[in-house]
């Protein structure tokens, strides 16, 4: 990637039970003192030159004052995503200090009745009619002055490859970025794009492996300055199959 002037970064997203481990039922004990995600974080930091962010400490601090994950799903809510966004942007700004970081004052933030229902659906529960309204009410972030437009495209329906292409009208934005990221990134992608001239989110959903070699020509044509690979903790194993274009 360096030959193509693309800077690679890694973002590791802890699972909800990692952040809220105090809610494990009595009788459950740790199998290993160090979790796999912690091992990956330490290994990448020690043996590679890839900058990596693992926002566990920021999330643990923020949970004292805010609910960060949906009770009925596996994803963080808007508040949790924003906490992680700040940590990610802190990492990127070390190399690109000109990047704009959105403040809470850039958003209208209000509690709304909303839900992420992947867990409740798996259990056959209608979350909105089963749980109290207060358990389904979370801070929702809306940008006051968005500058981006987005186009959603299915690149390959069979392989479930889809992209979200953002373009900003803000002339101060000069950099281009690609985020190879799963559904956790969907809670922040629309405002992460506010920091870039162009940003593409290549969606790695449905638990599938990274397919960077398949998208290599598209990535090269996009010519990003920044490539961020993000994965949730439960899909860590797919990092073992992560291949960069020049390896093909």
Describe the predicted segments one by one:
Residues 1-248:
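Extracellular glycan-modifying ectodomains
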